[in-house]
């Protein structure tokens, strides 16, 4: 492991909670952004059927 020396600078009891906490915050922010900036994700999460926006005409 080439990043093993990081624990000589930061204790694992401090570094691991910071790392896992920052990952959890980023995951929350990404999910919040997807839910607030799309119209179909919230409906999908609530079990609604997908609506077809346009129909394809047969040739």
UniProtKB/Swiss-Prot annotation:
It is a single-pass type II membrane protein. Coiled coil: none annotated. One of its GO terms (cellular component) is plasma membrane. The chain crosses the membrane at residues 12-35. Its main location: membrane. The core complex is formed by different alpha and beta chains, binding bacteriochlorophyll molecules, and arranged most probably in tetrameric structures disposed around the reaction center. The non-pigmented gamma chains may constitute additional components. Belongs to the antenna complex alpha subunit family. GO terms for biological process: photosynthesis, light reaction. Keywords: Antenna complex, Bacteriochlorophyll, Cell inner membrane, Cell membrane, Chlorophyll, Chromophore, Light-harvesting polypeptide, Magnesium, Membrane, Metal-binding, Transmembrane, Transmembrane helix. InterPro entries: Antenna_a/b, Antenna_alpha, Antenna_alpha_CS, Light-harvesting_complex. Residues 1-11 are cytoplasmic. This is Light-harvesting protein B-800-850 alpha chain D. One of its GO terms (molecular function) is bacteriochlorophyll binding. Pfam families: LHC. The keyword Membrane applies. Residues 36-59 are periplasmic. Antenna complexes are light-harvesting systems, which transfer the excitation energy to the reaction centers. Disulfide bonds: none annotated. A bacteriochlorophyll binds at residue 31. It comes from the Bacteria.
